[in-house]
Amino acid sequence: MNSATSETTTNTGAAETTTSTGAAETKTVVTSSISRFNHAETQTASATDVIGHSSSVVSVSETGNTKSLITSGLSTMSQQPRSTPASSIIGSSTASLEISTYVGIANGLLTNNGISVFISTVLLAIVW
């Protein structure tokens, strides 16, 4: 509910009026003076402050909450012969995916970490 209220204050030579109508507030200052040529002068300054309300609130999920999936593993696909039973295809592809995941994790560790490269080089030298 918007109700209009008005407040008037008179200071020495200046009349100040403030009007509030809920979401807007207007302040008017009128200053009267006499110039050096004995002319009456009036100066009016007015300022309006408007308070705006918005009902379009954006939820947190719409403000750019982005998740990305980064996979450093290798993706391998193998083509099975037509005579292969379905049960062995599932097992084979699962094992292949599992191995490629481990290889991808190891590859990511080796490329991102200089210490891992050094350790793997030492281990390869010991094995050979």
From Swiss-Prot:
Subcellular location: Membrane
Keywords: Membrane, Transmembrane, Transmembrane helix
Topology with respect to the bilayer: Single-pass membrane protein
Highest taxon above the source species: Eukaryota
Gene Ontology CC entries for this record: membrane
Entry keyword Transmembrane helix: yes
Keyword Phosphoprotein applies: no
Induction: By FLO1.
Region span, Disordered: 1-26
Transmembrane residue ranges: 105-127
Family the entry assigns: Belongs to the flocculin family.
Protein name from the UniProt record: Uncharacterized protein YAL065C
